Regions:
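Bilobed "Venus flytrap"/periplasmic-binding protein-like clamshell domains
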Residues: 1-34, 51-55
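Solvent-exposed, acidic/flexible segments
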Residues: 2-6, 28-32, 47, 84-87, ...
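Second-shell loop/turn segments in exported
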Residues: 3, 40-44, 96
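Ligand-binding clefts/hinges and TM-proximal coupling segments of bilobed small-molecule sensing domains
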Residues: 8-17, 65-66, 99-145
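A ligand-binding cleft/hinge motif common to bilobed small-molecule-binding domains
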Residues: 11-17, 38-41, 45-75
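Generic alpha-helical structural signal
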Residues: 14, 55, 91-95, 108
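Periplasmic-binding protein-like
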Residues: 51, 59-95, 117-140
Length: 146
């Protein structure tokens, strides 16, 4: 199993290994490209990483259709936006904008454009369907994270 040094995947795989009393042979790599090469060249059976990042990595392979992302996960790690803690006016603008984009369907269209459709100039399609966590946040917007 390939795991890129410095990522949260390192801690997740170690926690999983300990919780399930397993001995997983994992290869630490310097970057995503090296991890992908280990799997592509059959020197590793798997690559542990955020699903959306894996989708991007796989999409760049000439034989992308030979790889898949499992539905199972080692944990949930929400992405977020950061801005100054004491900037309530800016937070209000961000909240209003995001909620408006969700209500109008614009955010769903953007998601489809970038994750489910061919992306110029190479017309690569990540084929990355919206997961249940993202669907829930679109249905019930919150600044609390997942």
């Amino acid at each position: 199993t390939a795991v890129t040094s410095g990522t949260t995947s390192v801690a997740l795989i170690k926690e999983f290994e300990k919780a399930h009393n397993l001995k997983i042979r994992y290869l630490m790599t310097k970057d995503f490209a090296e991890s992908m090469q280990l799997v592509a060249n059959k020197r590793a059976d798997a690559f542990i990483l955020d699903d959306v990042l894996l989708a991007g990595q796989i999409s760049n392979l000439p034989n992308a259709s030979e790889f898949t992302i499992l539905d199972a996960s080692l944990g949930v790690e929400p992405y977020g936006a950061m801005f100054r803690k004491d900037d309530a006016p800016f937070k209000a603008v961000v909240d209003k904008t995001v909620k408006g984009m969700i209500a109008s369907g614009e955010l769903s269209k953007l998601y489809s454009t970038w994750f489910e459709s061919p992306i110029p100039p190479k017309n690569i399609n990540l084929n990355f369907k919206m997961n249940s966590y993202t669907k829930e946040l679109f249905a019930n917007p919150s600044d609390k994270g997942i």
